[in-house]
Structure formats: C-alpha cells, structure tokens
Amino acid sequence: MPFVEEEFEILKPTKALFFVRDVLKCSLKEAQRHLDKQRLKQNQQAVRKSQIIQGVVRLIHFKPNEKTQALVFETKDFGVFDKPHQVYTHPKGYFYHESLLDCIQSHFGKNAHPAHRLDYETSGLVLAGKTLQSVKDLKALFMQKKVKKTYLALAHGLVEKSMKIDKPILTPQNIQKDLHIRSKISPLGKQSITLVEPLSYNPFLDISLLKITPLTGRTHQIRLHLSSVDHRIVGEGLYGVADENAREYLQLKRENNAPLLMLHAASLEFEFKGAIYKIASPMPERFMPFLKDLSFFY
C-alpha cells in the first residue's frame, strides 16, 4: 500500500510541524497539510501543528511503489499515468487509501492534478497537468469534447455487431444514501451516447471483448449503458443486479474484497499546443484468463 504507518520516538520536545517537515523532507506548507489531514497521532489522538511533542508518535504518509508509479508518457506540460484498478483518482477525506493524486504530486509537485477521473474500479490512462494553468487547459479539452477516449471491456453475452447506445442518464445528487450512488437511465437525464464495437468472443465463457467509445462523460456511463442492453460488464456488481446484490457489492468494496471490474481506459487522443497525441495502454493482465479461448475476431 502506498500509505504506510511508521512509529517514531522523539527524544527531545519538538514542534509537530517541524517534525513532519524533517521526517518527510518537505516544505512547511506540505507538512501542515499532513497535520491537517490528521496523519500524525500520539496516543491515538491527532496532533495539532502547533503542538510540542515528545515520546512515541505514529505518522501515516505516502510511500510510492511500483504499482502506482505507472507514468507512461510525459511532456513539459503534462503526464499520462496508467491507473491500476481499485485505486481512487482523488483521495477521500481522512482515509488512508491508495490515491493516484498522491502519485501524480510525488512526480510533479503540489500544483499537479488529474484533468479527469476514472472510477475506483476502472483501470487505465489518466491525463494530469503539471501546473495549475496546464490542468485548466487540459480540463477545457475534456469539457469541449476534444479528447477521444476508448476503453476495453469484457461483457457477458455475444455482441455480434457494432451498436450505438443513446440513452439519457440521470446522475445521482446524494451519493451517501444507500444505493443512491447509482446513475439511472431516465428521460429527466442528460443525453448520453456510447459506441460499442465487438472485437472477439469466448464461446466457452459467453463473454465478448469490446472496444468502447463514450461520446459523453456521465457518471458510470459505460457500465450503465452496457447493462441496459443486457451485456453487463464482467465483475459489475452495481448495475443490472438486484438491489440486495448491489448492497452486498458495495459492502465488499468497502472491505476491498469486491470482484474485479473488467473495464480499462485503453487510449487517449487529443491535440494540445499544436501537437497531436495518441497514447495507448496495453491489455491489462486481469483480462487474460478470459481471452484464452477466443473463437473468432470481427
């Protein structure tokens, strides 16, 4: 795990802010951020930045590892990261879980941020700006639909031909309550379009490998659209299942035991400052067991 908890014994009275700065070799501002997130504790109590500490303390901090260090492409303005599955794009409050943002900022500094996001369950390419201005410019490309995103998905059933799924999606307003995290197809929702192209089929498992191109960017769009045409993604526990099963899935997710979702952001194409970029990610390892007995290619 990128977040580790280490124990330290402080022999002389020391200001907490200076202790964190010296241990992590960071700026005072960065040290203050760690303290604000309650990552330094003594006797199981969060330590304040102005507090003088001595004795045994425990510090939770980000320690990069190879899993989240997947920087696959870089320019002076941005980097592209290959996010692993079951990793958040952004951190959530005071919880100490894997976050791609920490990885991005460990590479490029505190002003670096993702220009878009992937679901926790989805792996693949994430574009990140190195400066506040480049983040703003890259986000504008996504808002203006000038970035072509393609995904790979393994879905249940035989998909015999390409299709266009055009169904409006209503995104949730209150994601804290029970199953309200789910988006839904509704005439009250925004127009949502997904292009689906079959690549191959495993007749023994009755699973299709699909190339997916979303033309809009609604929450859980690909997952919901495929479920709505009876081709639920392998590992999907939120859409196309009974409410009881969805609740069980969310509980397993909280326990980090949810099944792996077979959805991968495989490529990004865009123009930035006069240059055209096409960046691709290889087929993820978790797809491989499903692809051993492909009967044909389209």
Swiss-Prot record:
Active-site residues from the entry: D119
Molecular functions (GO terms): catalytic activity, acting on RNA; pseudouridine synthase activity; RNA binding
Domain of life: Bacteria
Alphabetical UniProt keywords: Isomerase
SUPFAM superfamilies listed in its UniProt record: Pseudouridine synthase
InterPro entries (alphabetical): PsdUridine_synth_cat_dom_sf, PsdUridine_synth_RluA-like_CS, PsdUridine_synth_RsuA/RluA, RluA_PseudoU_synthase
Pfam families, per database record: PseudoU_synth_2
Gene3D superfamilies reported for this sequence: Pseudouridine synthase
Top EC class, one word: isomerase
EC numbers: 5.4.99.-
Catalytic activities: a uridine in RNA = a pseudouridine in RNA
One Gene Ontology term from the biological process aspect of the record: enzyme-directed rRNA pseudouridine synthesis
Entry similarity comment: Belongs to the pseudouridine synthase RluA family.
PANTHER family linked: MITOCHONDRIAL RNA PSEUDOURIDINE SYNTHASE, RIBOSOMAL LARGE SUBUNIT PSEUDOURIDINE SYNTHASE D
The name this protein goes by in its record: Uncharacterized RNA pseudouridine synthase HP_0347
